[in-house]
């Protein structure tokens, strides 16, 4: 049993040899794609930040790293949805976005960052533009 426990422990808690060699190649191999990918993500980031800052009640700072933004929805807290529900917090806001516009976001409280919410920009420019337009429309409908 002791030997089986050791084998099982090593099998599930350690990185496999093939994964280790793949990581070595990824780190030491051709890096030419990184600059072009960085540029694409900067363009997507800038698009999302700009469009979210145009939405009523939202403010979005430009992140330095990662592939997501954390806009503040403090400006929509206390507002009413078209069906009369009051947005009381960031969780209410992301539920409202999902239910009315089909846009999925994560409420900031899940990360200890209320009243913010998290949006990934690791999607195509077309999808991001559409999602941001939907968010703008949802914010404009609040009173």
Residue map of PLM features:
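PLP-dependent class I/II
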Residues: 1-143
């Amino acid at each position: 049993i002791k030997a089986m426990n050791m084998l099982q422990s090593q099998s599930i808690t350690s990185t496999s040899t093939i994964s280790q060699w793949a990581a070595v190649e990824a780190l030491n191999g051709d890096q030419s794609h990184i600059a072009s990918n960085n540029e694409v993500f900067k363009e997507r980031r800038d698009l999302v930040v700009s469009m979210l800052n145009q939405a009523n009640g939202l403010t979005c700072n430009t992140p330095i790293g990662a592939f997501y933004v954390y806009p503040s929805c403090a400006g929509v807290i206390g507002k009413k949805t078209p069906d009369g529900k009051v947005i009381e917090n960031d969780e209410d806001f992301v539920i409202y976005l999902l239910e009315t516009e089909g846009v999925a976001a994560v409420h900031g409280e899940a990360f200890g960052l209320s009243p913010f919410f998290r949006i990934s920009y690791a999607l195509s420019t077309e999808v991001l533009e559409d999602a941001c337009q939907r968010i703008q429309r949802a914010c404009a409908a609040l009173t």
